[in-house]
């Protein structure tokens, strides 16, 4: 007679099924039709009922896991459908709307203005009520080069305030590049289905209506952040304290984030499970001690139970104050499960507790499964649990404080080694890099941050003078990290690995830290090698690969031959704190395994073409730069060997020919506008050819036709000036005769790029037009069919793609 499975095993398989079903749903390019989801939900419910009523045998466990997966798939699909139903109507994009709502969370200021989330209460368009999404991501900027903005955001903009705002909105749309940050996923996860900016004008001002009592946690967070910023003079230290006290990671400047990533301590600069656990432990200890002082309280509830529940409540409060991030959520759910199990007299194995916490997190936020923080957080705890020595081994505390201190030191070193080695494969998977000084940096940073800096940051909320001491500790830590970051080979970079290498690397990381026989652990390094140094297949000699990156309104193209890399333009500068180099090109180059740039060609000086060049030059070795930049330009002072871009120079790399066709040397003395000085580059391989044109305009197109009309024919044309009416003359298109035309322009470009009449010229000639706002990054492989990133990697939360001419 078969026996019922143990409850812990049943819950374990239920959790595995739930997580598997959720993961499968997140891979769908489009949501299933409602009838199909309804049928799947009914099947899942029937299977769950059968497995629960007849809980005997291994088959019932499999049925239970399948049922849980089916129900998770349906539940996630239903929530996704509700969010997609909140989408902004296309007819309202770019229109002047009047929206009333409440500031939903603490605003975040930058040099360019303030960003905030508005919980909407009503909207009108041309005096008529219209529907808008419940949450809007908005910018209120300081100054602009058109009449869209008046003044800037008010100093008193705070969470909980009700405003009536003139807005221009658009649907969520972000850059779409291989291995890039998925902005549309992040907005979808937050429930934000439109974004835009405040367009205050004298005749339609922004009006503050009231201060509400809502959003008390966000108001408290904002007050705490403002107090820290006023109390601490050093911006770097103030940003770290704000991140550790209230979870405001945006307060940390980009330079400090780069330093923390290089040295492997970035995980400490957000409120993590370690911080929440220590806070809960301290709160439980204090509550238990105080509880024992009152006999009536002891009669009502035992002190250990009161301490556990009190610690849980305090942990939840701290996690809310921290912004309820995934690591904090995971810890709160784990503590809650342990408290419930202890209260009921049950003891589950730690893997079951960990999986139950993962189910709780994904039940509230299924899209957390796609975030690096989810996997780093849960895998870190799982590795520490899996690598624990036997309980008997740990239970024997040696006599004497020195021996106990030595044991604690060894345990700390071992824990750090487990985290560093075990998480290295995941770091390579998500970031294509791992810090080589992370072990040493964390030996100092973990005790300093968790035992001193983070507690003092919190204590400063009650006693602000403590922040001055805490700031000094942060400054010392940053100085030490900078010294570590100055050593050679501070970080190991590698290309994004194929799935088989990822699987081998993750298995190797587990074997490296698990308490297994050495015969098995010896396989750890060989298994991790394909992930740490994955095979990269360059184009064969005589051929090249082209990637037109999706960088919004601007230009950035990668050209890779067998042994060389050319970057043509570096995209725009998005703000005074962000550019295409940092946000798009560096992650893309890192994922492709590009260690250096052989030639950086900047077509002309416009900011949408050179905005990311500085970041590129500072982060990667750049062998040479060619441009039409004027003498004295800031980029020429960065130490890269430079030659002036002018017609004539031609060279060959690995059997692929390159030739500069424009401008002429004589053009440099004529004070032409920047567009007229665009570097035009022709690239020819054995199988394909490309013509890169920058912002070339019609007069220069005509001059180029006279000089080289017979040799302009190319398979691919980078559409001049993003499809502006100033360019793409009919005669020029007839000479080039492209099969594909690539337009790099922003979504709903404020300049109207690409112009419909220009696109009609291409359509009349049978040219296939690829638009980056619809296609994402476009790749022309050396061998195979060209493809759009939005087509091959589409998920249901993404903005619709497409390559057709409008």
Regions found by a protein language model. Name each.
Residues 1, 5, 764-765:
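Helicase C-terminal subdomain and adjacent C-terminal extension
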Residues 2-4, 60-267, 578-590, 596, ...:
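Membrane-interface helix/helix-cap signal primarily in integral membrane proteins
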Residues 6-51, 371-374, 466-514:
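Membrane-embedded alpha-helical segments of integral membrane proteins
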Residues 13, 21, 196, 248, ...:
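Hydrophobic alpha-helical transmembrane segments in multi-pass membrane proteins
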Residues 56-79, 518-540:
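Internal/C-terminal transmembrane anchor helices
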Residues 100-102, 124, 149-155, 159-162, ...:
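Non-globular, low-confidence helical/coil segments that flank catalytic cores
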Residues 213-231, 240, 248, 256, ...:
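Hydrophobic alpha-helical segments of integral membrane proteins
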Residues 416, 443-447, 720:
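Transmembrane helix-bundle signature of multi-pass membrane transporters/permeases
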């Amino acid at each position: 007679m078969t026996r019922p499975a143990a409850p812990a095993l049943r819950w374990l398989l239920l959790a595995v099924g739930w997580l598997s079903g959720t993961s499968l749903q997140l891979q769908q390019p489009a949501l299933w039709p409602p009838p199909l989801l309804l049928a799947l939900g009914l099947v899942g419910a029937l299977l769950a009922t059968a497995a629960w009523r007849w809980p005997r045998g291994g088959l019932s466990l499999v049925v239970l896991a399948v049922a849980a997966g089916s129900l998770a798939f349906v539940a996630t699909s239903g929530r996704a459908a509700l969010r997609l139903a909140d989408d902004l109507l296309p007819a309202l994009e770019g229109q002047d709307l009047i929206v009333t709502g409440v500031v939903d969370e603490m605003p975040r200021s930058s040099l360019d203005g303030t960003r905030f989330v508005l919980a909407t209460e009503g909207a009108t368009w041309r005096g008529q009520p219209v529907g808008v999404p419940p949450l809007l991501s908005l910018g209120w900027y300081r100054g602009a080069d058109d009449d869209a903005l008046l003044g800037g955001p008010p100093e008193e903009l705070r969470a909980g305030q009700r405003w009536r705002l003139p807005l221009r909105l658009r649907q969520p749309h972000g850059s779409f590049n291989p291995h890039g940050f998925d902005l549309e996923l992040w907005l979808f996860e937050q429930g934000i289905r439109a974004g835009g900016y405040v367009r205050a004008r004298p005749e339609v001002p922004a009006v503050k209506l009231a201060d509400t009592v809502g959003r008390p946690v966000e108001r408290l967070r904002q007050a705490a952040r403002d107090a820290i910023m006023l109390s601490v003079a050093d911006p770097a230290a103030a940003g770290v304290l704000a991140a550790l006290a209230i979870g405001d990671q945006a307060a940390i400047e980009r330079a400090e984030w780069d330093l923390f990533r290089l040295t492997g301590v970035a995980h400490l600069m957000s409120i993590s499970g370690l911080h929440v656990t220590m806070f809960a432990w301290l709160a439980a200890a204090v509550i238990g001690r105080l509880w024992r002082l009152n006999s009536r309280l002891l009669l009502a509830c035992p002190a250990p139970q009161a301490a556990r529940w009190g610690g849980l409540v305090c942990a939840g409060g701290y996690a809310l104050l921290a912004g309820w991030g995934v690591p904090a959520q995971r810890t709160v759910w784990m503590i809650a499960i342990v408290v419930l199990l202890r209260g009921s007299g049950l003891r589950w194995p730690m893997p079951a507790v960990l999986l139950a916490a993962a189910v709780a997190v994904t039940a509230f936020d299924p899209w957390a499964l796609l975030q690096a923080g989810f996997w780093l957080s849960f895998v870190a705890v799982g590795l520490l649990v899996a690598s624990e020595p036997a309980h008997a081994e740990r239970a024997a505390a040696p006599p004497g404080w020195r021996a106990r201190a030595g044991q604690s030191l060894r345990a700390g070193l071992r824990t750090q080694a487990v985290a560093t080695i075990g998480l290295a494969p995941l770091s390579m998977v998500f970031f294509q890099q791992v810090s080589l000084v992370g072990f040493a940096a964390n030996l100092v940073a973990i005790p300093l941050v968790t035992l001193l800096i983070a507690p003092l940051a919190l204590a400063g909320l009650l006693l602000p003078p403590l922040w001055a001491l805490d700031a000094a500790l942060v400054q010392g830590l940053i100085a030490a990290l900078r010294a570590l970051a100055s050593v050679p080979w501070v970080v190991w970079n590698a290309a994004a690995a194929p799935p088989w290498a990822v699987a081998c690397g993750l298995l190797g990381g587990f074997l490296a830290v698990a308490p297994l026989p050495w015969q098995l652990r010896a396989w750890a390094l060989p298994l991790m090698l394909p992930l740490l140094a994955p095979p990269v297949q360059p184009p064969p000699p005589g051929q090249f690969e082209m990637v037109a990156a999706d960088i919004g309104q601007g230009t950035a193209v990668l050209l890779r031959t067998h042994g060389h890399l050319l970057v043509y333009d570096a995209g725009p500068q998005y703000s005074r704190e962000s550019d295409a180099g940092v946000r798009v090109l560096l992650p893309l180059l890192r994922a492709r395994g590009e260690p250096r740039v052989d030639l950086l060609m900047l077509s002309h000086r416009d900011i949408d073409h050179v905005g990311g060049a500085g970041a590129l030059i500072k982060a990667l070795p750049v062998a040479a730069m060619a441009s039409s930049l004027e003498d004295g330009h800031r980029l020429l002072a960065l130490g890269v060997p430079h030659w002036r871009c002018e017609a004539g120079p031609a060279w060959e790399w690995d059997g692929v020919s390159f030739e500069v066709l424009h401008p002429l040397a004589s053009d440099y003395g004529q004070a032409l506008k920047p567009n007229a000085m665009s570097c035009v580059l022709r690239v020819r391989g054995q199988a394909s050819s490309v013509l890169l044109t920058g912002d070339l305009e019609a007069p220069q197109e005509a001059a180029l036709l006279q000089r080289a009309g017979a040799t302009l024919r190319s398979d691919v044309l980078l559409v001049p000036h993003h499809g502006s009416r100033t360019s793409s003359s009919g005669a020029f298109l007839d000479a080039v005769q492209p099969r594909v035309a690539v337009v790099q322009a922003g979504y709903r470009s404020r300049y109207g790029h690409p112009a419909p009449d220009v696109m009609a010229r291409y359509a009349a000639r049978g040219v296939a037009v690829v638009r980056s706002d619809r296609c994402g990054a476009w790749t022309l492989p050396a061998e195979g069919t060209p493809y759009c990133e939005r087509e091959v990697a589409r998920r249901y939360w993404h903005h619709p793609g497409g390559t057709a001419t409008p």
